[in-house]
Structures are given as structure tokens and as C-alpha cells.
Amino acid sequence: MQPLLLLLAFLLPTGAEAGEIIGGRESRPHSRPYMAYLQIQSPAGQSRCGGFLVREDFVLTAAHCWGSNINVTLGAHNIQRRENTQQHITARRAIRHPQYNQRTIQNDIMLLQLSRRVRRNRNVNPVALPRAQEGLRPGTLCTVAGWGRVSMRRGTDTLREVQLRVQRDRQCLRIFGSYDPRRQICVGDRRERKAAFKGDSGGPLLCNNVAHGIVSYGKSSGVPPEVFTRVSSFLPWIRTTMRSFKLLDQMETPL
């Protein structure tokens, strides 16, 4: 089955439909201070994704959310309002995992280095990451949040969230031929009408207040289960990348 990337393109073809968090609810304003809203410019046009703050100068998201120009909004609840909690920062660098495969959507993870550090407060604050190779048991209840649209004609401007359960790997293996249990997580009970959908790509899967996953892809119908990038499998790359670019910037600083 051809997987559906869950980013939301602004320039959609006639008849295409984009969706929001399915079966969810509006989040309590500013209760998720790590959430990032990404406005992306690429050769294919404009799109938007989610992401999450992992350090004062880095946001983690999906590699398929790459663009030549990315504007990041943090501290937002309603993305169409000028909230005094919001911080708008451009991405200095978009660093995709070197083994990201656009065809199979393997290693769908990317770091955005911000052009300046965020001002940390109760509305903007990094989220905790898991330990290396830390797993999740099937049945674990987690939460996904995002700003995906409802339809072509009506959208949601406020952050929404939904609770989803981790599934056994075989649920995704039977649907998605390229699913890799070592680097991906199968999420969402097919018996429930709850899921992430277009526009939610790059957002975090929070389990016990730890960002274990990144929204990656699912079926075009929006019916679960869906595939999330397993953050714990990429911790060495995340840490090495953030450290190396910090050192590079120090070397480039003029005397």
C-alpha cells in the first residue's frame, strides 16, 4: 500500500482533501510548550508541518517536511492570531538524516537549527527525549498533537490532540511493506476512529511526557494504524548533530 505522508500542502489539487487530528479535542491553550508550527517553502510549493523543541536552538520534525525556507512558530495555540506568547524564528539549517529514503520513508527524521535561541518560559520549553533504544509496550496510551486541517473548506487554527495506543508491530507490517520495527512505531487502534492526519507530520508522540515518536505516514483514508519514527533509535545521531553544528557555529564566529 502506498503510504500517505501527513504534511499539508497549501497548493492542493482539485478534489484533494486535508484532515485534522481525527477523533481528538482542542488542547488546553499553551499546555504543550514544546510544540512548533512549521511554514515550509520548497520547490514543490508551500506546506506546513508540526515539530517539537528539543533544545533552545533545535526543533525535531520529520525529514519529509524539508524545505529551502522554514519559518518556525513556538508558543502558539491559535496560529492565525498574534498571541503575545508566540516566538517566530527562521530555521538556519534543515538537517535531514543522511539515510532518509524518500521512497520507503525510512529514517524520516530531521533537525532544524534555529537562527537564534528561544526565550524559555512556561509557554516555550523543550520536551524530554527517551533513553537510547527505550521501547514502548503495545497498549501504551500516548498523545499526538497538531494543527492539521478539517477539510478544504474548513480548518482548525487551534492546537488539537488525540490519545492513541501503541500497537503490535505486526499490525503495521501487514499493511506497510517498508515498516521497520527497529526504527518505527506502530500507533493507533484500527477499531477506533482516532488518528493523526494531513498537516500533523513532524509532531511528537508523547508517552508519559516523553517524545517517543514523530508523526510520519499512514493510509490515505486516515484509518489507523499509522507509522511514527522511533526517536530512541536516533538519539546518537540527534546528539552528535546538535553538538557538531554548535561547534561549527563557534568556529565561524568572527573575532
Swiss-Prot record:
Q: Glycosylated where? A: N71
Q: How is this chain modified after translation?
A: Two C-terminal truncation variants have been identified, one which ends at Arg-243 and one which ends at Ser-244.
Recount the UniProt induction comment for this entry.
Induced by the Td92 surface protein of the periodontal pathogen T.denticola. Down-regulated in monocytes following M.tuberculosis infection and exposure to bacterial lipopolysaccharide which coincides with increased M.tuberculosis replication and intracellular survival.
Domain Peptidase S1 as annotated: residue spans: 21-243
Q: Keywords for this entry?
A: Antibiotic, Antimicrobial, Cell membrane, Chemotaxis, Cytoplasm, Disulfide bond, Glycoprotein, Hydrolase, Lysosome, Membrane, Nucleus, Protease, Secreted, Serine protease, Signal, Zymogen
Signal peptide position in this chain? 1-18
Topology relative to the lipid bilayer, per the entry, is:
Peripheral membrane protein
Show the propeptide residue ranges: 19-20, 245-255
Q: In which tissues is it expressed?
A: Expressed in neutrophils (at protein level). Expressed in B cells.
Database matches in CDD domains = Tryp_SPc
Fill in the subunit field for this protein: (Microbial infection) Interacts with CASP4; the interaction is promoted by the Td92 surface protein of the periodontal pathogen T.denticola and leads to CASP4 activation.
Catalytic activity, as annotated = Specificity similar to chymotrypsin C
Coarse class of the protein's main subcellular location: membrane
The protein's GO terms of the molecular function aspect are: caspase binding; heparin binding; peptidase activity; receptor ligand activity; serine-type endopeptidase activity; serine-type peptidase activity
Give the subcellular location: Cell membrane; Cytoplasmic granule; Secreted; Cytoplasm, Cytosol
Superkingdom, taxonomy of origin: Eukaryota
Protein's UniProt name: Cathepsin G
The annotated region (Important for antimicrobial activity) lies at 21-25, 97-111
Task: Spell out the catalytic residues.
Answer: H64 (charge relay system), D108 (charge relay system), S201 (charge relay system)
Name the Gene Ontology biological process terms.
Answer: angiotensin maturation; antibacterial humoral response; biofilm matrix disassembly; cellular response to lipopolysaccharide; cytokine-mediated signaling pathway; defense response to fungus; defense response to Gram-negative bacterium; defense response to Gram-positive bacterium
Q: Which family does it belong to?
A: Belongs to the peptidase S1 family.
Q: List the disulfide bonds.
A: C49-C65, C142-C207, C172-C186
